[in-house]
Regions:
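A short alpha-helix capping/helix-coil boundary motif
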Residues: 11-15, 35-38, 53-57, 147-148
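Generic N-terminal amphipathic, Lys/Arg-enriched alpha-helix
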Residues: 2-20
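Short amphipathic alpha-helical surface micro-motifs
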Residues: 2-4, 28-30, 116-117, 140
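Generic signal for short, ordered secondary-structure residues
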Residues: 5-6, 13, 40, 58, ...
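Alpha-helical packing segments of well-folded alpha/beta enzyme cores
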Residues: 27-30, 34, 168
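N-terminal glycine-rich anion-binding loops that anchor highly charged ligand groups
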Residues: 3-7, 31-33, 39-49
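Active-site-proximal beta-alpha core segment in soluble small-molecule metabolic enzymes
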Residues: 43-168
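A glycine-/small-polar-enriched, mobile loop at the entrance of the PLP active site in fold-type I
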Residues: 15-24, 43-47
Length: 168
């Protein structure tokens, strides 16, 4: 690792506490790495707003990333209004009273089950005919030993398993 003094540009005594401090140069260097991956692979890399929703930095981030991932209405709205670009929305269960706005804001909506897809796809087509729909796949592979944090644990309802997948 490169040793450097992060306080050259920052006087910690001037920051309110608690604070989130972001080194913009480091952020941009990381974004350049992600952009190089996109260019080499043809993949689109999206900002996961669940992990980083500091919209102050969205103008910088959108120079490099194609859009955002949203986990519901509020994140979809934030991505649409503040980031621009693509908005991909996923939720384990969409709420009927929110879905019209989610559909209007999102270019891609991923459903957790075939029943959710069947229920909401007509509304997605009604409110945003150009939006794409998908199904979350449960990979049935775990990297954690703690069941509580394992989306692939037995009887998990997060995504469709291979045994329950239907080709349509």
């Amino acid at each position: 690792p490169v040793e450097r003094n992060i306080y050259k540009k920052l006087d910690p005594s001037r920051c309110p506490s608690p604070s989130f401090v972001v080194d913009e140069d480091d952020l941009e260097n990381n974004l350049k790495i992600l952009d190089s991956v996109q260019k080499r692979t043809g993949a689109k890399i999206l900002l996961a707003q669940k992990g980083f929703a500091m919209f102050y930095f969205y103008p910088l981030i959108r120079k490099y990333l194609k859009g955002v991932c949203a986990s519901g209405l509020n994140e979809a709205r934030l991505g649409y209004e503040e980031f621009g670009g693509e908005v991909h929305t996923y939720s384990p269960a969409f709420r009927e009273e929110e879905f019209e706005e989610i559909a209007r804001l999102s270019g891609h909506v991923v459903f957790n089950s075939f029943s959710q897809l069947e229920k909401f796809l007509p509304l997605l087509r009604k409110y945003n005919s150009s939006a794409e729909a998908g199904i979350r796949i449960n990979p049935e592979h775990s990297e954690t030993e703690t069941a509580l944090y394992d989306p692939c644990r037995p009887l998990s309802r997060l995504g469709v398993t291979a045994a329950n997948f239907r080709e349509e």
